[in-house]
Regions:
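Helix-loop module immediately N-terminal to the HCX5R catalytic loop
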Residues: 53, 57-100
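Intrinsically disordered, low-complexity regulatory segments
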Residues: 6, 55-65, 177, 183-191
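Catalytic cysteine-centered active loop of the rhodanese-like fold, especially the PTP/DSP P-loop
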Residues: 92-121
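Glycine-rich, flexible N-terminal cofactor/catalytic loop recognition
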Residues: 2-54, 59
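A structural signal for well-ordered alpha-helical segments within the folded catalytic domains
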Residues: 84-87, 111-112, 145, 149
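PTP/DSP superfamily signal
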Residues: 94-98, 119-191
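Short catalytic/ligand-binding loop motif for oxyanion handling, primarily in non-cytosolic enzymes
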Residues: 41-42, 67, 108-112
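Anionic group-transfer/hydrolysis microenvironments
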Residues: 36, 62, 104
Length: 191
């Protein structure tokens, strides 16, 4: 299974990858969006030590499809993505340039941000095509549903983007979502 995959839309491309791959290949891109946990230390964020680095957008939000249970939902380290995060990602995109979107595993947060960008590029009415393109780029993608919901609202897609993602759900993706939530909540002591 490849660690990263790309698609061309216009003269640029979108690649979705895990952090370790992104760290090695970062100079091959014009723009990078990194999705990190809110408590990620600066030294763990991709760094550039040579001149002329790619443009970098750092987004910090937890990989949960819905908020942690109260009272944990107010904790800074369990911050969900916001509309501002999505606006930043969409404004950061340049379709003519090579874009890398990464998160820790390259499966959920990065695929949801990439889907928002694909849907934005393709325009209203093409939500199923955008989701199809996402799964062509990254067959193992399990896009973060909270991020997809935000993108759907921000792009005024009337639920069509979220519906297109949910139509592709499998028992495996549902199980991955469940295990991911359990792991996050256990890690942050929310049991």
């Amino acid at each position: 299974m490849p660690h990263a995959s790309a698609t061309n839309l216009g003269s640029g491309s979108i690649t979705i990858a895990p952090y370790t791959w992104a760290k090695r290949k970062k100079r091959e891109f014009d723009r990078i969006i990194g999705c990190y946990d809110p408590d990620t230390q600066r030294r763990k964020i991709i760094q550039f030590h040579l001149p002329d680095p790619p443009a970098l957008l750092v987004l910090k939000f937890v990989d949960l499809d819905e908020p942690a249970p109260p009272p944990h939902d107010a904790r800074k380290e369990l911050r969900l993505a916001s509309g501002d995060d999505l606006v930043s990602a969409l404004e950061f995109d340049r379709p003519e340039e090579r874009l890398l979107v990464h998160c820790h595993a390259g499966i959920s947060r990065s695929s949801a941000i990439a889907l928002a960008i694909l849907a934005g590029r393709m325009g209203a009415g093409n939500e199923r095509i955008a989701v199809g393109e996402l799964f062509r780029i990254k067959p193992e993608a399990v896009p973060n549903l909270h991020v997809v919901t935000l993108a759907d609202r921000l792009l005024a897609r009337d639920g069509q983007l979220l519906e297109a993602v949910l139509a592709c759900e499998t028992p495996r993706s549902r199980e991955r979502r469940r295990l991911n939530r359990e792991a996050y909540l256990a890690y942050y002591g929310c049991n």
